Amino acid sequence: MQKHNIKLNQNQDISQLFHDEVPLFDNSITSKDKEVIETLSEIYSIVITLDHVEKAYLKDSIDDTQYTNTVDKLLKQFKVYLNSQNKEEINKHFQSIEAFCDTYNITASNAITRLERGIPITAEHAISTTTSAPSGDNKQSSSSDKKFNAKYVAEATGNFITVMDALKLNYNAKDQLHPLLAELLISINRVTRDDFENRSKLIDWIVRINKLSIGDTLTETQIRELLFDLELAYKSFYALLD
């Protein structure tokens, strides 16, 4: 960026300088470069904001629903910026969240953890974000009473099938699989907040896929392994309903 030398005449009022526009970008910067810089600045702001939200939640300054909605929105915005039209240029400056924070001297350990895992902590640990429900509609709170909401069970079942079908159709990229797996986990949490065998494997896969770089894909071996773990989780989920 060009440096502007300011020279004042003795009779010149310094207040006039405050009316002069100070350019944010050097004239030599192209529109594409400007867009890349603006995108990186948005990513920077998301990291800082997310870290504050995580800390606020840990201090009980915001409730589960506020936290989940805010973090979910920030994570989606983060992914949109990384997958923008200029993603090739963005990736030159964003090798990883850790490298990005080191480059711009960002201290945000809570945000880094959340961005690496790719889902709100309430989804990861099956923390309920429902404060109330209509009578007869809130039957998914525990497996001990053996009562589950039929609608939520159907949604979770459908999401299991959707993910497995996607893998069989050779879906193997981060942007293809992560949203499907995240939605699957959320739908499972609506049915029950109790842990069950192989649930942790779903979370491991969500985190593992979220850490893939743009352009990286799962290998055939990894796809078979994911399918196998999904089938085990599906059986364990249904065993919980019996």
UniProtKB/Swiss-Prot annotation:
Which terms are listed as keywords in the entry? Cytoplasm, Endosome, Membrane, Protein transport, Transport
Which residue intervals make up region (Interaction with VSP36 and VPS20)? 148-242
Q: Topologically, how does it sit relative to the membrane?
A: Peripheral membrane protein
Per UniProt, residues of the VPS28 N-terminal domain are 11-125
Location comes to:
Cytoplasm; Endosome; Late endosome membrane
GO BP annotations listed: ATP export; protein targeting to membrane; protein targeting to vacuole; protein transport to vacuole involved in ubiquitin-dependent protein catabolic process via the multivesicular body sorting pathway; ubiquitin-dependent protein catabolic process via the multivesicular body sorting pathway
Pfam families linked to this entry: VPS28
For this UniProt entry, what's an example GO CC term?
A: late endosome membrane
Q: What is the effect of changing L40D?
A: Abolishes ESCRT-I complex assembly; class E phenotype (malformed late MVB)
The keyword Membrane is annotated on this UniProt entry: yes
Main location class: cytoplasm
What GO MF terms are annotated?
Answer: protein-containing complex binding
The remark listed among the other comments is: Present with 1420 molecules/cell in log phase SD medium.
Q: What does this protein do?
A: Component of the ESCRT-I complex, a regulator of vesicular trafficking process. Required for normal endocytic and biosynthetic traffic to the yeast vacuole.
Family of this protein? Belongs to the VPS28 family.
Q: What is this protein called?
A: Vacuolar protein sorting-associated protein 28
> What species was this sequence derived from?
Saccharomyces cerevisiae (strain ATCC 204508 / S288c)
Task: Tell me the gene name.
Answer: VPS28
